[in-house]
C-alpha cells in the first residue's frame, strides 16, 4: 500500500463515480455504433480481384477497449479499497469519523465546517486533525 495522501483521499469520490461509469460502459459498449467497423476484402468471383467493403462488428476493437476499461476498473476498485481500509484503520473514533464524513461518505464533497457541525468541533480543529493524522500515518 502506498503512502496515504490528501490527494488520494480527495480522489476517492471521483474514483467511485468513475467505477460506476466504467460498469455502464462495459455492459453497454456492444450496443454502441462506435463498434461498427468496415474492412475491405477482395472478391475473386469474376476471376480478378474486386475490392468489396464489408461492414460489421469490430471484435478486436471491442475486446481491446473492454480489457482496457476492465483493468482501469480493477485498479480503481483496489485504490478505493485501500482508502476504505486506511480510514477504518484509524484508531481514534473522532478522527475516523472526520475522515469518513469528509472523504468517503456521500457523492458530493463536504465542507470542513459541515463536518465540524456533525462532530461538534470547530472547523480549524477538523483541518488540524486531518493534517496531523496524515503527517503521522
Tell where the protein language model's regions lie, with residue ranges.
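Short amphipathic alpha helix immediately N-terminal
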Residues: 92-105
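C-terminal flanking helix
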Residues: 134-137
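N-terminal interaction/assembly modules
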Residues: 1-86
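Short alpha-helical "recognition helix" segments of helix-turn-helix
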Residues: 111-119
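Key DNA-contacting residues within the recognition helix of helix-turn-helix
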Residues: 127-131
Amino acid at each position: 500500500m502506498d503512502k496515504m495522501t490528501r490527494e488520494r483521499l480527495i480522489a476517492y469520490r471521483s474514483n467511485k463515480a468513475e467505477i460506476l461509469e466504467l460498469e455502464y460502459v462495459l455492459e453497454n459498449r456492444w450496443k454502441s455504433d462506435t463498434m461498427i467497423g468496415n474492412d475491405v476484402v477482395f472478391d475473386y468471383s469474376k476471376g480478378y480481384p474486386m475490392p468489396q467493403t464489408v461492414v460489421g462488428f469490430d471484435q478486436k476493437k471491442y475486446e481491446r477497449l473492454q480489457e482496457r476499461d476492465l483493468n482501469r476498473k480493477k485498479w480503481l476498485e483496489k485504490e478505493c479499497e485501500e482508502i476504505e481500509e486506511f480510514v477504518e484503520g484509524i484508531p481514534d473514533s473522532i478522527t475516523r469519523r472526520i475522515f469518513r464524513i469528509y472523504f468517503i461518505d456521500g457523492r458530493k464533497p463536504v465542507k470542513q465546517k459541515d463536518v465540524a457541525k456533525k462532530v461538534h468541533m470547530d472547523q480549524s480543529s477538523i483541518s488540524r486533525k486531518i493534517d496531523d493524522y496524515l503527517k503521522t500515518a
